[in-house]
């Protein structure tokens, strides 16, 4: 099982971000940690009663927002409380996101003492002009300093988040960003193409013509360069946007793509939990508003969460949607075990059609996207959807 905690506090909201994150709310951090621990205890009690044993967490992920904004004493209280409530595996992968502009040794001390053994830093870009366009508060020298601090504290499993297809970004600038990231010797890189989200300042500037995106050919070249350059440096692609040195693929991410049950705590956090011996999964989502979440916890008004059972058809499609994002692909044997029916019976005709189009390949009992299929993944999934 996997555990996710959402820490929605930010020093400044990035211009492209549509996540549940809030600037200027630092005064609520203590109350928020109280709420997280209360929710953790309640969920642990419920599922321990349902399963007859405590929840064992194989991975833990602190996301945001900016978890590194949490004061060290609050981080210590949170992580200590989680260990009291859950059975966290001794070899658990324990990741925290961090912003290079907010990281300091005291926070890292508390993180390591609480079990954090993997750090994901939001570098995003190398060039100051692009960081300004994104509304980031750091520069590359702060990324370098953060990496040094993390290693000095004993965290050597380091991931960097990068973004391509940005307004004003050229292919040469993207290569420069990759080179800068690689100079820091990370174990993992996440390389995301920008998706301008409605309601964000960046999307408004694009719609107004103030900013413009690279053309499709340039963005494709950026992705091709990512595959070539990272492979040359020993990185293995294990998902469309994720690359790792051997042995350093993110276990938390892999669990999500393989439909491992996960428990989410905090504002906007989602869970997908087994309610009846693998035959009835339920997805629930907490309210996204910070104060709405705190109010829910204070009043114990759990009905403000959205809760929906995952139908068998949804579960089948999610196996394809999530599995095809990975380079491993979708296993015919695993599909049969999970859903009690053959992949060929459910999707055979459509899979073979996509294979004939050069978008899927079939080998060793797995269906995988081809390189061309990665470019049109959404079209592949539309073909696989039920009519």
Feature annotation, model-predicted:
Residues 341-353:
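Short amphipathic alpha-helical interaction segments
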Residues 8-21:
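Local cysteine-cluster metal-coordination motifs and their immediate loop/turn environment
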Residues 366-370:
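Minor-groove-contacting beta-hairpin "wing" of winged helix-turn-helix DNA-binding domains
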Residues 355-365:
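A short, conserved structural fragment
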Residues 372-387:
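Short, amphipathic alpha-helical interaction segments positioned at domain boundaries
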Residues 1, 21-47, 55-341:
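C-terminal scaffold of the Radical SAM
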Residues 1-7:
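Immediate flanking context of iron-sulfur cluster ligation sites
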């Amino acid at each position: 099982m996997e555990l996710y905690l959402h820490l929605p506090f930010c020093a400044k909201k990035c211009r492209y971000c549509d996540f549940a994150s809030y600037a200027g709310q630092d005064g609520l951090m203590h109350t928020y940690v109280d709420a997280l621990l209360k929710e953790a205890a309640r969920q642990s009690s419920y599922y321990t009663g349902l399963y007859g044993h405590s929840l064992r967490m194989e991975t833990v992920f602190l996301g945001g927002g900016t978890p590194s904004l949490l004061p060290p004493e609050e981080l210590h209280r949170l992580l200590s409380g989680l260990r009291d409530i859950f059975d966290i595996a001794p070899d658990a992968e324990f990741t925290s996101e961090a912003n290079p502009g907010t990281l300091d040794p005291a926070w890292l001390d508390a993180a390591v003492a609480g079990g954090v053994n993997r750090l994901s830093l939001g570098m995003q870009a190398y060039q100051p002009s692009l960081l300004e366009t994104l509304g980031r508060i750091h520069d590359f020298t702060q990324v370098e300093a953060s990496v040094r601090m993390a290693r000095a504290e004993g965290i050597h499993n380091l991931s960097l988040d990068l973004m391509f297809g940005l307004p004003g970004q050229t292919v040469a600038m993207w290569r420069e960003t990759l080179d800068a990231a690689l100079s820091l010797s990370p174990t993992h890189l996440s390389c995301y193409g920008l998706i301008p989200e409605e309601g964000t300042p960046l999307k408004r500037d694009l719609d107004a013509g103030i900013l413009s995106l690279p053309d499709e050919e340039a963005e494709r070249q950026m992705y091709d360069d990512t595959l070539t350059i990272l492979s040359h440096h020993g990185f293995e692609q294990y998902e469309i946007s994720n690359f790792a040195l051997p042995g350093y693929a993110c276990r938390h991410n892999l669990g999500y793509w393989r439909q491992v049950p996960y428990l989410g705590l905090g504002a906007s956090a989602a869970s997908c939990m087994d309610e009846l011996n693998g035959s009835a999964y339920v997805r629930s989502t907490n309210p996204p508003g910070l104060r709405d979440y705190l109010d829910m916890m204070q009043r114990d008004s759990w009905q403000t969460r959205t809760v929906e059972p995952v139908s068998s058809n949804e579960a089948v499609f999610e196996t394809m949607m999530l599995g095809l994002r990975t380079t491993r692909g979708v296993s015919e044997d695993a599909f049969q075990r999970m859903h009690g029916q053959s992949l060929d019976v459910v999707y055979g005709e459509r899979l073979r059609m996509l294979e004939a189009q050069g978008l899927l390949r079939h080998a060793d009992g797995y269906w995988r996207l081809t390189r061309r299929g990665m470019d049109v993944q959404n079209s592949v999934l539309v073909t696989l959807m039920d009519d």
